[in-house]
A protein has these predicted regions:
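N-terminal beta-hairpin/loop module of FHA
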Residues: 1-35
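Short, conserved secondary-structure segments in the cores of folded domains
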Residues: 11, 17, 32, 51-53, ...
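Generic beta-strand structural signal
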Residues: 14-15, 45, 90
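Structural recognition of beta-strand segments within beta-rich domains
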Residues: 20-23, 51, 80
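Buried hydrophobic-core signal for structured, non-transmembrane domains
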Residues: 41-43
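Short, basic/aromatic beta-hairpin or loop at an interaction surface
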Residues: 50-61
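C-terminal boundary/linker segments immediately following FHA domains
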Residues: 62-90
Length: 90
């Protein structure tokens, strides 16, 4: 669920397989922000785990204030991409 950012606040996105996140209109989750790369990150379902992977973005991806490359998401984790903050719910 997006909890802050320029738009889509309150919008949720189910993770079914792989969810692409970025500025490009080809992503499942589109974040319109100059700090967001065109292909910024993806969330992948592996078994019972959701894995957040930064796709070598220009400005990085943070989970709970820590910059990550790959991270197993837990309920209530806060994901920051550009000026957008999302909260992971399982």
């Amino acid at each position: 669920t997006i909890i802050s950012g320029a738009e889509n606040v309150g919008k949720s996105f189910p993770v079914d397989g792989t969810v692409s996140v970025g500025r490009s209109h080809t992503n499942k989750v589109i974040l319109k922000d100059s700090k967001v790369s065109r292909q910024h990150a993806e969330i992948t379902l592996r078994g019972n785990e959701c894995i957040l992977i930064d796709l070598n973005s220009s400005n990085g991806t943070q989970v709970n204030g820590q910059k990550i490359h790959e991270h197993i998401l837990s309920p209530n984790d806060e994901i920051q991409i550009g000026d957008f903050v999302m909260q992971f719910q399982k």
